[in-house]
């Protein structure tokens, strides 16, 4: 009976020593947090392993995360994953539909973004910019011929339209001359002609019937206007005037002293033509509603795909610039030692307990062997 008791006692003592040894070893990973001094000499194993190697641990964890976890290939693969693209697209689409239920004007949106008096400031900026740019254009181009300022496409179109302009002019002239107003105008011109020539005019009026003579001039005028030679002459005149206009420099048409006034006038006309009150006070949703399906079905998926593809393509540069290793190291360094201990215990508390129990089991087994050997010796 004493033999069995001795063996059991040795087992209990060995188990206790083994369990306590492992428990103390585990605690020494974290404790003490600071070095302990005795007679001005630091005691061994103080501070604990993790507090002592905290900076090195943070640095190595950062390197491991970047080298083996958040690698360039892993990030690129995740960004190009179809499931991620679908989830991001669905999230943005949902947010878009939620915003479409609201009534938000550009003024309100810019106000939320911290841009006060958006309408007034935007119009003022546009007005200043337009006037500056128009003035700069007039100044830098004042020695340039109009042919260089007019776009070639517009120049070609205007040149092609000259015969049509001629037809338009002759047509309008024919209509006017053939009208009653034209007849009256011709008669008044004849009367004025006779009056301006004094006695000779008075004598001519004695032999000429103004009404019949006016009708004759009206008829001959219509014949003259509708002749091809007349149309050709008008067309040649228009062409010549057009070429003369193109050959002129800008400063001939707009003298330097009038450029500032013209710039201000053009700016004022443009600003008045812009419906800024409607633009800034009309709900954005009303403008977008006609394109809602196109935005959700085409634009958002396309934008998400392009965005993720861009980030994936430049993932190496982004990771390098973000310096994830340093970021992880910095974040770990901000943890207090109790927080690190709590984090490790929460993650591997069960395993740490099993190590303690294993120490007790091994200690007990060794105690049994020691008890048996003690009986034999």
From Swiss-Prot:
<keyword id="KW-0812">Transmembrane</keyword>
<feature type="transmembrane region" description="Helical">
    <location>
        <begin position="357"/>
        <end position="377"/>
    </location>
</feature>
<dbReference type="GO" id="GO:0005886">
    <property type="term" value="C:plasma membrane"/>
</dbReference>
<dbReference type="InterPro" id="IPR016991">
    <property type="entry name" value="UCP032178"/>
</dbReference>
<feature type="transmembrane region" description="Helical">
    <location>
        <begin position="1"/>
        <end position="21"/>
    </location>
</feature>
<dbReference type="Pfam" id="PF04286">
    <property type="entry name" value="DUF445"/>
</dbReference>
<keyword id="KW-1003">Cell membrane</keyword>
<keyword id="KW-1133">Transmembrane helix</keyword>
<comment type="similarity">
    <text>Belongs to the UPF0754 family.</text>
</comment>
<protein>
    <recommendedName>
        <fullName>UPF0754 membrane protein lin2327</fullName>
    </recommendedName>
</protein>
<keyword id="KW-0472">Membrane</keyword>
<dbReference type="InterPro" id="IPR007383">
    <property type="entry name" value="DUF445"/>
</dbReference>
